[in-house]
Amino acid sequence: MNTKNSNEARKYTEKDKWGYVVCFGTVLIFIAGIGHVNSFGLIYKDFIVDTHSSAKSLTTAHGVFSIMLAIGGLTLNVITKRCSLRLGGLIGAVIMSTGSFVTVFISSTNQLPFTFGVLQGVGFGMIVPVCYSTFNHYFVRKRTQVMSLIKATQGTILIFYPQLLKVLLSRYGFRSTLLLISGISLHTFPGVVAMNMSTKTNKNRTANVLTIENGTNNQETADLIDKHKDKKESQIDVATKNIKLSIFKRDVLEMLNVKILKDPVFCNICIGQSFVNFSDLIFFVLQPMLFYQYGLSTNQVAACISISAGADVAGRFGLAFISSIASINTRLLFYVATILTLAARIVILQVRQFIWLAVVTSFLGVLRAWLHVASPLVISHHVTHEDFTGAYAVFMLSTGLVNIIFSPIIGLIKDVYQDYIPAFYALTACCLPCLFLWPAEYYLKYKLNK
């Protein structure tokens, strides 16, 4: 008996130890995969000028990347019915690394929607669910605490990423820097290899559903084949195809969680958050370009990006501390952070001195952390635990659609006016759907309940 307990204790100890390897792999994947994304303006500024490219291609690339993340996740869901989760992640790493390497040879930013948006988007979209699924397998009680530590570690490393890119660009040039970034992306492979779960992979769920639905009819089908093999064979084939087709349709509907779209509150949450998250992403991608237009040097722009990353980390730690001593309404937090973000962006479009730009950027970094932390929690608090994965996939698709539709419009505004400021006002206005639709929802609920 004691030997059995000792073996079980050793088993769980080894599982806990490997769980921290999974944490390291998760940090490695996010840094290697998308660590450079916030520094796009720093990387491509001179390239856009030299090739006479448009800013629309840069924003479109991020729009495509956003929707391809969701498609990559759905693709992984299909692949893992026939192979292991880790193998699906490795396929994603191959696709993402290929996209990163091909980017080295682009002749204009018009190729970025494919090399970065499609290839890297689908690849990274296949890797992320592998990370979170493996993480959830190893951590249950300490999940929030450990995930906060992972995100804080990522943020701390990202503080120094713009400075590293600035050095690489000055010493090795544009193409060599892209080649080094593609080399860094190869670190996603050891990160995915670390995603090892001790449990065996489930068998093909489609086959199981087919067996369950036809369980009572299996013997009858066999009898029909034996008695009327020649006459009924074609009918059985047609029936089998119809059953498989109906199961496929149901799998697609389950995968997309279409039933959640019947919930108007969830749809309102999706619309509001999709516009805010789109606005946040494109704002920080184009922010270095705006600062260059203001006349800041490369050192000052890199410093602002690092300050924003540091403020993001501080915001996460601060929110973790506040939530440990007081209960926080995550939807209210998201709404208040959106209001403050709108105000701070208007301010940053009025000032030109480096010190004030750095101060407002740090404030925006804190608000960005609050938005990112609250975003999935708003959804998880509204839907059941069983529906969360499907609901979040629908939200990712919603965000991707907003990105792919409105990203080119933002880039077009900049190209038409030959000025980044009108484009940033348009990005700021993207906060308004959330700020107007959410209070309208509360007003209608209050009026109906009165």
Task: Tell where the protein language model's regions lie, with residue ranges.
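Conserved MFS/SLC helix-loop-helix module at the cytosolic interface between two early adjacent transmembrane helices
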Residues: 71-110
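Helix-loop-helix hairpin linking two adjacent transmembrane segments in secondary transporters
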Residues: 142, 149, 153-205
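C-terminal transmembrane helical hairpin of 12-TM major facilitator-type secondary transporters
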Residues: 279, 294-300, 317-319, 323-378, ...
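Helix-to-loop junctions at the C-terminal end of transmembrane segments
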Residues: 72-85, 315-329, 414-415
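Hydrophobic core of transmembrane alpha-helices in multi-pass small-molecule transporters
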Residues: 31, 99, 111-126, 151, ...
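Long, low-complexity inter-transmembrane loops of multi-pass membrane transporters
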Residues: 1-15, 190-271
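Intracellular juxtamembrane helix-capping segments at the cytosolic ends
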Residues: 47, 117, 124-139, 146-147, ...
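Extracytoplasmic gate region of multi-pass secondary transporters
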Residues: 36, 40-47, 262-320, 372, ...
